[in-house]
């Protein structure tokens, strides 16, 4: 369970950023985001486990760069949208597309794929582990979107800028952690 919670922390931070960008997201939007992130986060260790040692060395060389680049681009897009935003009353409610959520979910789950690779070498039930990671991520992301909503209501039109900075921060932390290992 500790592994599952650890794997979901990046997704939680990204979800807070997403929640700040959504004007008054409903619980259904938070659940939708949680499901997308949870499914992706639960599947990536399975993919990593299946790849096993075949691609471990090559994936480890660039996984952090992919995550950093995706989160940087998504963060910059959110900041740009925030800078262009009009007053909250004049802007339509935002609903993040499936593909935008999936890209963010994938970027925050690359580390789970690497964990899956390492799990291929130990005696572990990968299905239970992957399900626990997916469930923990679902719960953390759903909570993160709602926390982001509170921050967004306080921050007003700056919420999307803050959300973009949060995504860029998550990407930077991922890059830093891998470069200093």
From Swiss-Prot:
Give the highest taxon in the source lineage.
Bacteria
- Keyword set includes Transport: yes
Main localization of the protein? membrane
- Its topology with respect to the membrane? Multi-pass membrane protein
One GO cellular component term = plasma membrane
**Single Gene Ontology MF annotation:** manganese ion transmembrane transporter activity
- Does this UniProt record's set of keywords contain Metal-binding? no
According to its UniProt entry, the function of this protein is described as: Probably functions as a manganese efflux pump.
Q: Which family does it belong to?
A: Belongs to the MntP (TC 9.B.29) family.
Could you identify this protein by its name?
Putative manganese efflux pump MntP
Q: Which organism is it from?
A: Nitrosomonas eutropha (strain DSM 101675 / C91 / Nm57)
């Amino acid at each position: 369970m500790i592994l599952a919670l650890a794997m979901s922390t990046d997704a939680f931070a990204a979800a807070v950023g997403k929640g700040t960008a959504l004007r008054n997201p409903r619980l259904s939007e938070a659940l939708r985001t949680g499901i997308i992130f949870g499914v992706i986060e639960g599947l990536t260790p399975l993919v990593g486990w299946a790849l096993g040692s075949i691609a471990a060395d090559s994936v480890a060389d660039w996984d952090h760069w992919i995550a950093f680049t995706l989160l940087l681009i998504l963060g910059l897009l959110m900041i740009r949208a925030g800078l262009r935003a009009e007053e909250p009353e004049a802007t339509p409610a935002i609903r993040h597309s499936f593909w935008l959520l999936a890209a963010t979910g994938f970027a925050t789950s690359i580390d789970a794929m690497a964990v899956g690779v390492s799990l291929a070498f130990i005696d572990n039930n990968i299905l239970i582990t992957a399900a626990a990671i997916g469930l923990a991520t679902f719960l953390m992301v759903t909570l993160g979107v709602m926390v982001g909503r509170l921050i967004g209501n306080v921050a007003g039109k700056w919420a999307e800028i803050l959300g973009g900075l949060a995504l860029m921060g998550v990407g930077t932390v991922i890059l830093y952690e891998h470069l200093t290992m």
